[in-house]
Amino acid sequence: MSDIHIRQDGRAGRITLSRPKALNALTYDMVLKIEAALDQWRADPTIDLLVIDAEGDKAFCAGGDIQEMYETGTAGNYDYGRKFWRDEYRMNAKMAEFPKPVVTFLQGFTMGGGVGVGCHGAHRIVCADSRIAMPEVGIGLIPDVGGSLLLARAPGRLGEYLGLTADRMDAGDAIHAGFADHFVPRETWPALIAALCDTGDPGAVGRAAHPAPRSRLADWQPQIDACFGGDTLADIHHAMPDPGPEPIAHAQKLMARNSPLAMACALRIIRTVRGADDIRTALEHEYRYTARSMERGDFLEGIRAAIIDKDRSPKWRHASWRAVPEADIVAMEGPVTDAPLQF
């Protein structure tokens, strides 16, 4: 069975991720097939909108399939990882810039690479079990697939909070943070998809939507804004009272697990992208970091600890946020000239 099902259904171009046992993680082949569909449907007059969903109950897409990246990277070959990211980011840009309405149905986990497929459209639908996150700093990477732009656009300093903690958002949080648009009960999704395919009218989404659930992050926003406005990790940590209220104690607990270098770089890129507010600029800056993440960063060690050995005890390059010098951040952020990202 194919990992992805691409077809026309009435007035809709449909993309269904079909690797439920792997939480619909994106393979390199899936990335290329999604890009080809976007290219084909962009100017097709018989396609009015896109509908993107996934099989299974546990996840829309829990990220990228990074097994081969780890195997090639630990052998000293970084070309495959760079190629994967270049082609994935090009697809992400085409998704964000697609000239027709894109409707995505985000059940269960939507993380990392799943955000790049599911969260750049104009009609992003969540339900009661939706959980959305940019968890990259937990594996030594930075928020990518255009996620840095979504974080930069989040209210107040919520983008910094989500990018540095890798905290998970429920449906209400995702809508508040700008990663989703509509809350629609899961049991009504088949009827909504049928209506979208029959009519090609994205207005059906708004008519099916229910009020958004209360957002924990909205309640926490004042404390988050007070602590996550600093220019550096040190500034942010110094702004956190100890002991602090629940939001700050929760943030400190999450950040203690993450790569100090990845967090420092994530903070830098969110601030840089906020000034540009452009998907291609975001992806180009993300690629500067990811292209170097295996050789100079913590990505391979993060994958080893989380996925390969599963010991959850990564040995990061820096012992703490206090130990990340500015020079190490600068070394990750220059343009990539030997294998540049091209759109």
Please describe what each predicted stretch is.
Residues M1-D53, A93, A331, F343:
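Conserved CoA-thioester-binding segment of acyl-CoA-metabolizing enzymes
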Residues I15, I52, D65, V117-G118, ...:
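Hydrophobic/aromatic residues within transmembrane alpha-helices
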Residues A54-D87, G140, M332:
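Glycine- (often His-adjacent) and acidic-residue-rich active-site loop
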Residues M95-I139, Y161-D167, A171:
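Glycine-rich beta-to-alpha active-site loop
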Residues G121-D144, H176-L192:
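Gly/Pro- and small hydrophobic-enriched strand-loop and loop-to-helix capping segments
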Residues A154-T199:
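Loop-centered beta-sheet repeat module
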Residues H182-N258:
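Amphipathic alpha-helical blocks and their helix-capping loop/short-beta junctions
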Residues Y289, G297, E301-F343:
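C-terminal amphipathic alpha-helical interaction region
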